[in-house]
């Protein structure tokens, strides 16, 4: 449910140190167009879109930062066009492969967006994506947000919670259910649920390619993420012997939002070295 706003503090820090930052919004999210047909959304199509984006801008010597769907979509670019990338930063994500264990958190997320699930049935009529992000980043409790909304009450988002809620709601303001087709469909494209829509076969190939990379690879992992747990992050890092692994202690799934300056400083240190 996010967009490039998620990287706002990371971008601010990197630009202040002279780096050029490019933060695209996937189609269906952020400031990009919103395709209303849910069947349009699949990972192979988004991967192709991103490949065209990189090629049109002729991006080279890229340090790529990926998280969540950035793994399947973003790391595919590195696997297919390695000559364009000089460094990789991997945060709380995955690539489908034989033996990968989908956490209870992932399975619950799929269930909540399945037909009749908690979020599928109530977003955006009773509960907005901005409210979900305020809750997911611990700016408001579930009791004061989603539970109130489901009971017909209007959650009150104050201070930082209000700022976050407004920012993540902004791209979907006034669009209704059809305008939310991207957020509805993405969870259903996880290969645990749908191997074809999730582009599982290509993810498997890309996993092997990424693990054989010779460029610097840095893992930065939020330790409190129930979706992509720390043990998985460390296991993946161990498959790339020259990679580094940093725990972002206390960070949840959307670590860029809550721990941006810390992530930026780690990346700056690695790039300087």
Q: At which residue positions do the language-model features occur?
A:
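Conserved HGGG/HGGXW glycine-rich cap/lid loop of the alpha/beta-hydrolase fold
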Residues: 1-31
